[in-house]
Amino acid sequence: NPYDIQSVNVLKDAAAAAIYGARAANGIIVVTTKNATKKGKVDIDFSANLTVYENKNMDYADNFYMTPAQQVDTEAKYMEYYLTRDNALDNMKKSITEGSQVTPIYYDYYQFASGKISRQELDSRLAKYRTNNYARDFADNVYHTRLLQQYNLALRNSSDVSSNNLVVNYKHDNAELINNDLDWLTAYYKGSFELAKWLKATVSVNGLYSDQKSLGYNANYRGSFDPWTLPAYMPFYNEDGSIRKTYYWFTGNEYWDVPNGFHDLGTDPVSELKNNVKTNTRQNMRYMADLEFRIIKGLTANAMFSYEIDNVEEQTHANEKSLTSRVIRNAYTTVDAAGRVKYNTPENGGMLQTTNTKGKYYTLRGQLNYSNTFFKKHDVVAIAGLEFRETKLNGTKSLVLGYDEQLQN
């Protein structure tokens, strides 16, 4: 918790090893947390921060891309040349009917070359393309202003024999993309107690809970969520105002006839952000206890024990309409010589992938520390200790195809 930091120091090499043992031989970073400033009173600290991030600059020229008008002019000039080549029309038809990625201008020139539209209609379409701005419309629908909210409450008190610190921190991040966010809550308690002149005890408990929602794995991420990979002049909307589907790389194009039994792989980014969602939930608890025995002047002994539990559940739900589910169904669909279609995965439903990991960790350490100065100029520092550590991590992973969330209720 950055709000609870008093100071940060770096100890290198011998200085670190002298205090923290051989495992710190390469140096350590010491983070000192805050304590109460006045004895007998309770310090209350509260802070609230709101960070507003600047919206992404989606201007083509500012990002070193051709503007929509420049792209239209350049591609149109190329297509005028391309039509003079041998077999141009046949090659264009093959690209379209076989599902290759083609641009709107490519398809318009194919229609013009095959006599389906006139030169006047072609010029009219090109003029309309020059007024489009795909990246701008994409940003208006997919991005929103990123807001980061942070709240911190700290209660601290101290006396001659004890000190107590309780710190609670909450963070919410809307993550810029629609249907994405992060909630993060931590609570920390630390207490130090002088049980006797020769004994000091320190205990601490730290709890963390986080819940994050983001876009699940998308095989066509660049084609759906990277506007710079698509023509700048491409319409973001259909004529009826709905969002136009995009096609990229292996997903075909909007002009071909999808083979019987297979699913069209066009996607629009707004729907995909709702149809394919990954959630990550984490719960972490850490407990620590430390006893310091003051044996004689300059000689102390420490016994420390810490135990940590970390549970993480990651779940990706791509529903039936998501691109991921459609890609899976197409990939495992076969057609025999007679044209019969066979589905090797469920025909309906989506995908649910779940990963659970559970970590348990403990550290037990005993250490003797000696530090003294003789004759006001000879410093003697020595440590001897023994440490036991265990790290245990296990988990499960599952994949369900044909998953329908409505049937689970």
Predicted regions located by residue number:
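Short acidic/polar hinge/loop motifs at secondary-structure boundaries
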Residues: 1-12
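Short, glycine-/polar-rich solvent-exposed loops and beta-turns at beta-strand/coil boundaries
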Residues: 1-3, 20-25, 180-183, 217
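Transmembrane beta-barrel domains of outer membrane proteins
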Residues: 11, 32-34, 154-158, 167, ...
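N-terminal periplasmic accessory domains that precede
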Residues: 18, 24-48, 151-153
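A generic beta-sheet turn/junction motif
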Residues: 24, 37, 157-161, 170
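Surface-exposed loop/interface segments of Gram-negative outer-membrane beta-barrel transport/assembly proteins
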Residues: 38-133, 175-180, 186, 190-284, ...
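Outer-membrane beta-barrel initiation region
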Residues: 141-145, 155-159
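Transmembrane beta-strand segments that form the barrel wall of outer-membrane beta-barrel proteins
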Residues: 168-174
